[in-house]
């Protein structure tokens, strides 16, 4: 049985924990090293059990604590070639640090790892699919302006899907963000709205998804209740019942539970 925990999930900072078969990894390090270590301790997870860190892309809310965390954990960090290049240019990584995701099989992990490209305004951005020995896949898919066919092919068939439900379009359009920022978020390389996220869910559940985690919610342009209602309403309209066909929860900004999946 695998374990998944959204340690941090919001526009302010992101970090996920995934473990299966005796191997444990982190996805992103968008808060301070101290916050990440505290979150692990709260879940009785030893930092020494982490064997790698996977990075989705180089935006600050996904890499803010990475440099210090790597100094503390002494583990490899993996990402796309473009992401690694950007992190070195930002001096978050040294020239010697960073392993291209194409070399992931060189690590002694108890599960497979696949990086898939996402549509986001950051070169080399992507999401991850983890495949344990029993074949029950987990996808982590946030920071995307649209669900492309590449993304859809990657996440269909996953038992557990972490998917972005970033904003309510009405709240964003009527909110205080500057117009250029609103346009960026709404673009095909921005962030996924509640409605766009919900549209994808029936297909995912019919393809075998049983655990849905809505993630990367905006604190300013969304609420957990609104994201949840939007998702469940669309699923219900498609004849899919919560509890019997799927389970769904919203990842909080911090303090998310450990899910046994």
Regions found by a protein language model. Name each.
Residues 27-30, 50-58, 78-81, 139-142, ...:
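Active-site neighborhood of phospho(di)ester-bond hydrolases with catalytic His/Asp-centered motifs
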Residues 59-63, 84-86, 122-123, 147-149, ...:
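Active-site environment of divalent metal-dependent phosphoester hydrolases
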Residues 149-250:
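Cap/insert and terminal regions of metallo-dependent hydrolase folds
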Residues 1-43, 126-143, 160:
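Conserved beta-strand hairpin/beta-sheet module of binuclear metal-dependent hydrolase folds
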Residues 81-136:
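Metallo-beta-lactamase
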Residues 5-15, 58-64, 88, 113-116:
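Structured catalytic core of nucleotide-sugar glycosyltransferases
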Residues 64-73, 89-90, 222-229:
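Metal-dependent catalytic neighborhoods of phosphoester/phosphodiester hydrolases
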Residues 33-79:
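Active-site metal-binding motif and surrounding structural segment of the metallo-beta-lactamase
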């Amino acid at each position: 049985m695998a374990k998944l925990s959204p340690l941090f999930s919001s526009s302010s900072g992101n970090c996920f924990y995934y473990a299966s078969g005796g191997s444990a990894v982190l996805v992103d390090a968008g808060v301070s090293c101290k916050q990440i270590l505290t979150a692990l301790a709260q879940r009785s997870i030893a930092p020494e059990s982490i064997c790698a860190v996977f990075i989705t892309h180089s935006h600050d809310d996904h890499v803010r604590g990475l440099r210090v965390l790597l100094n503390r954990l002494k583990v490899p960090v993996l990402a796309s070639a473009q992401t690694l290049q950007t992190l070195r240019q930002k001096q978050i990584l040294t020239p010697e640090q960073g392993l291209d995701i194409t070399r992931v099989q060189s690590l002694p992990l108890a599960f497979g790892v696949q990086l898939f490209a996402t549509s986001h305004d950051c070169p080399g951005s992507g999401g991850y699919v983890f495949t344990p020995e029993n074949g029950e896949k987990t996808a982590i898919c946030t920071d995307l302006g649209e669900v492309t066919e590449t993304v859809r092919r990657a996440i269909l068939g996953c038992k557990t899907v972490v998917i972005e439900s970033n904003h309510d379009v009405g709240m964003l359009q009527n909110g205080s963000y500057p117009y250029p920022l609103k346009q960026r978020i709404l673009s095909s390389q921005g962030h996924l709205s509640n409605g766009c996220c919900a549209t994808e869910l029936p297909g995912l559940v019919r393809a075998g998804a049983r655990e849905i985690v809505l993630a990367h919610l905006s604190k300013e342009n969304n609420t957990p209740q609104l994201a949840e209602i939007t998702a469940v309403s669309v699923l219900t309209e498609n004849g899919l019942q919560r509890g019997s066909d799927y389970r769904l929860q919203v990842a909080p900004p911090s303090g998310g539970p450990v899910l046994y999946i």
